[in-house]
Amino acid sequence: MADTSVEKLAAEVGKSVDRLIEQFSQAGMNKKQLDTVSEKEKQQLLDYLKKQHGADSVPTKMTLQRKTVSTLSVASTGGQSKDVKVEVRKKRTFVKRDDAELAKQAELETQAKAKAEAEAQAKVEAEAKAAAEAKATADAKKKAEAEAKLKSEKVKSEPKVTKVADPETAAAKVEADRLKATQEAVLTQKQKDEAAKAAETARQLAEVNSKRWAEEERQRLDAEKNGDHHITTSKVARAAEDSSDADDEKRGRRARNKNANKKRGGKDARDGREKHMRNRSTAPESMAHGFNKPAAAVSRDVRIGETVTVSELAHLMAIKATVIIKQMMKMGTMVTINQVLDQETAQMVAEELGHKVVLIRENELEHQVLKDRDDNIQLESRAPVVTIMGHVDHGKTSLLDYIRRAKVAAGEAGGITQHIGAYHVETENGMITFLDTPGHAAFTSMRARGAKATDIVILVVAADDGVMPQTIEAIQHAKAGNVPLIVAVNKMDKPDADPERVKSELSQHGIMSDDWGGDNMFVHVSAKTGMGVDELLEGILLQSEVLELKAVRDGMAAGVVIESQLDKGRGPVATILVQEGTLRQGDIVLCGLEYGKIRAMKDENGHAITEAGPSIPVEILGLSGVPSAGDEATVVRDERKAREVALYRQGKFRDVKLARQQKSKLENMFANMEEGEVQELNIVLKADVQGSLEAICESLAKLSTDEVKVNIIARGVGALTETDATLAAASNAILVGFNVRADAQARKTIDSESVDLRYYSIIYNLIDEVRAAMTGMLAPEFRQEIIGLAEVRDVFKSPKIGAIAGCMVTEGIVKRSAPIRVLRDNVVIFEGELESLRRFKDDAPEVRNGMECGIGVKNYNDVRVGDQIEVFETVEIARTL
């Protein structure tokens, strides 16, 4: 072959020119791109590259590949087995270590072997030496014992003298102890040396082998990455790794099938079972369960909060939720696993199941907030809070008007009080705060709140009317609140006034006049003329002095919500009666489920004020929502904590309400299943104040019967909004506004959806119209009335109709269109209708009393002489509640 250039040679071998020039340079030849290359130079370069790549040296790496093919029978879905070919490929790479490394490892192994032999030899020598020393010690001990025995025998035969220690025996004993201590020290030191040598040898071997192991691991990973390998992980592939394993599997399957085909109960089968039981491996003792089922019932201390679900209660008692559900079914209550239970119900269930109950208080933050108050302030006298109670139209508000020199009763709708009015009056002898409560039966909760917040109750009884139902209820509220009661016998200016009758009737309910030796003061008054009003005020102040009413004046205020409403321009407004402390503008108030900072304060006359002391009623603005009447209002220090407490109360109120609703839903469901479908009258109710809203809801709830139920789907305080109208339209409800009106947007929705809208200002009218609507929803009642009676005198046969009864109408009137009954001996034997009614061969629509007629009964021919034909009508009767 002729010489060639470097550039052509690079193109032939498939390398770049620069790389080829670099390899020539490494081989000791300097070449450029245009230089020629001879055959000798090519061979020289080839020899260098072979040497560089190790072609001439002994190979240091060897790879072995193995491939095995086997057949495995696998059961198919059709019940037949099919053969599956399984191919297993294995690849293993061996790497030869360097000679220097092998020599070093061999040297280390030789050293370790020599060291181990030396240690073994030393150990054998030490053991031999120890055995010799032990033998010498034992011989010395035996010799000493023999000498001691001989001496003791000699002493027995000689007279008793004082013993003297043998010097030789003592010396032998000391020498034995010294040898023993020396042996123990030598043995301990030898063990320490052996442990140190073994640790050093292990460390050296680890240093040598760590590099080798790392290199082998790297080479193995490279081989797996670059080589053709197959990892078998499936159960089938592992089972088919060897053909002999597959054959064993087939033989085992045939043996199992053969055993399965044996007759049951035979001797072979029994022997096989016994052999199987003998050969069956038992689990090791360490795998046995450490838990044993309790032999007796376990009683736990169950901590229950204000509300808890059934699943949470089961977790606390370490039982299944089904046990609690069964227990509550036994107690007469149906629950689900996620139903919320109140604290009392959960306590009963836990105690029934034999556990101890610990009731926990979750409102710790609320307790801390309410406890953080000024308690070190002195008490001062305060004005009495007087509640005026009595029956409707007995003159409560008129009497208060005369005291206040104002006309409030004229402004009330219908002349009756429908709100709690709070007023304070300055008299010559001091200040008095009056609460005017409604007297109508619907306002029971209002009167109860008035009695709770009061110091003295004035019971107004009309002298011409006497004791009435709400009078008795007021007496009960006063007694329940343990409040002193003063009776004001009103309307004494009327000619038919009879105060003695009032005293007599009140005595039947435990109210005895002081004139009759009782404890109650009776004052005769007239709201028109003012008779006895001064004596009444003096009696109130006298009673307050006896009670010694005192309160904190300069501390943080606390009171009770008398009334609340949602004002369109001002937002939530609450009337609060301050009971202690001084309420100031800017205070943070926690009021039931609501909280807020007081933005403005007004008295009962609408005048702006900045603070209010004890026994002063005041209107406040700035709460987050409308509080419920009767809630306690408390001034707190931190608005953030007040918000947390209010949110906590709202969540708890929601949980308790949900628990009650679920319980009532289940009860209603079972009642409906028993009694059938119940008609519902849906109502969306809005009122001007919270107290009126509660009174209306209670009155409407009392109207519900077994057949018609009043369902108040939404209630609230404030004007009727578009949301209320939309809800009423969606639920087919009546929209009711009590002393409130609908805004413009709500009126558009009401007109477009044709919602039934009702406005009321007097509670009587509202209740009467709802009762009338419920009456219209009652299922009609039908009654059968007998309108005529005819007696059969003779029977004729007609080829077209059949039997024709010749009758005489003895009572009422017989109509052809009315249904009839055929009576024989006053027993109904047929009920149907007339087919023919004739008089003198002419069809007649009706035949009256005392006339004869021919009657053909449809589908009935067994009419006999003496039978009676009774004609009746079904009449619908209107029902009332």
From Swiss-Prot:
Residue segments, region G4: 490-493
InterPro entries registered for this protein in UniProt: DNA-bd_dom_put_sf, EF-G-like_DII, EFTu-like_2, IF2_assoc_dom_bac, IF2_II, IF2_N, P-loop_NTPase, Small_GTP-bd
Region ranges (G2): 415-419
Gene Ontology cellular component list: cytosol
Biased composition (Basic residues): 252-265
UniProt cross-references to Pfam families, sorted A to Z: EF-G_D2, GTP_EFTU, GTP_EFTU_D2, IF-2, IF2_assoc, IF2_N
Top-level taxonomic group: Bacteria
Positions with biased composition (Low complexity): 198-207
Compartment annotation: Cytoplasm
Segments of skewed composition (Basic and acidic residues): 142-166, 209-231
A GO term, aspect molecular function: guanosine tetraphosphate binding
Binding residues annotated for GTP, in chain numbering: 390-397, 436-440, 490-493
Key words, A-Z: Cytoplasm, GTP-binding, Initiation factor, Nucleotide-binding, Protein biosynthesis
Region of interest: G3: 436-439
SUPFAM superfamilies: Initiation factor IF2/eIF5b, domain 3, P-loop containing nucleoside triphosphate hydrolases, Putative DNA-binding domain, Translation proteins
Listed PROSITE patterns: G_TR_2, IF2
Chain positions covered by the region annotation Disordered: 142-170, 192-288
Annotated stretches, region: G1: 390-397
Region spans: G5: 526-528
tr-type G domain boundaries: 381-550
PANTHER family hit by this protein: TR-TYPE G DOMAIN-CONTAINING PROTEIN, TRANSLATION INITIATION FACTOR IF-2-RELATED
UniProt similarity note: Belongs to the TRAFAC class translation factor GTPase superfamily. Classic translation factor GTPase family. IF-2 subfamily.
Function: One of the essential components for the initiation of protein synthesis. Protects formylmethionyl-tRNA from spontaneous hydrolysis and promotes its binding to the 30S ribosomal subunits. Also involved in the hydrolysis of GTP during the formation of the 70S ribosomal complex.
Protein name per Swiss-Prot or TrEMBL: Translation initiation factor IF-2
Gene: infB
